[in-house]
Regions:
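Short, charged/polar surface micro-motifs in flexible loops or helix N-caps
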Residues: 52-57, 63-64, 96-98, 140, ...
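Small-aliphatic-rich amphipathic alpha-helix that forms the alpha element of a beta-alpha
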Residues: 33, 90, 96-144
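C-terminal helix-cap and adjacent tail motif
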Residues: 3-12, 154-183
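Structural motif
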Residues: 87-89, 155
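Short, electropositive alpha-helical surface patch
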Residues: 142-153
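Short, well-ordered beta-strand micro-motif
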Residues: 49-51, 91, 159
Length: 183
């Protein structure tokens, strides 16, 4: 798959199964994150790769968050199962670093670009994934359990694995509605 085909046809895959990327495939995914746009070479990101028992640990953190935040019984019951929807979840964190020329929003954007690069690298190697956020990405209890600082921000949970089925074709949105040209 060439790069342009990958970019024009990328789709999230919510149904994932084992195996997850391992060995060189995982190393390529990790290295792709390092090529994200990065003003002043701050590397304002950190990643936690959860697999096997790590998925259960992340699920326990979600469950505790649901309990502490007075979620419904159904949400509390569902919380520990969320990370088990894929054989691997990469927690992507924007790790803010004070810099006079690189504001917080730019560092969050950089970490977000790293997530996109990882998903594209996964797809290029025959895997796929879905970038999820939700309440747990913005929960102080989750941040504390992951030992993040108050300045850190979870930009998402990248679920990775082998596609459980082929995603049906869907036309891409028309780009014309989103671009204005000044000439």
């Amino acid at each position: 798959m060439d790069a342009l085909e990958l970019l024009l046809n990328r789709r999230s895959q919510p149904r994932l199964k084992a195996p997850a990327p391992q060995g060189d495939a995982l190393k390529n995914i990790m290295q792709a994150a390092m090529r994200a746009p990065d003003h002043a070479s701050l590397a304002p990101w950190r990643f936690i790769v959860c697999e096997e028992l790590g998925l259960n640990k992340l699920g326990s953190i979600f469950e505790q968050s649901a309990i502490e935040n007075d979620k419904s019984e159904k949400e509390i019951e569902r919380a520990p199962q969320l990370p088990l929807r894929a054989p691997m979840v990469i927690v992507a964190i924007a790790q803010y670093k004070e810099h006079e020329k690189v504001p917080r929003v730019e560092q969050i954007a950089s970490a977000s670009c790293a997530v996109m690069a990882m998903q594209l690298a996964a797809v290029a190697q025959g895997f796929n994934g879905i970038w999820r956020t939700g309440a747990y990405a913005h929960c102080e209890l989750v941040k504390a359990a992951l030992e993040l600082s108050s300045d850190d921000e979870i930009v998402g949970f990248l679920y990775l694995g082998t596609p459980a089925f082929e995603i049906p074709d869907k036309p891409a949105p028309n780009s014309d509605a989103h671009f204005t040209f000044w000439r």
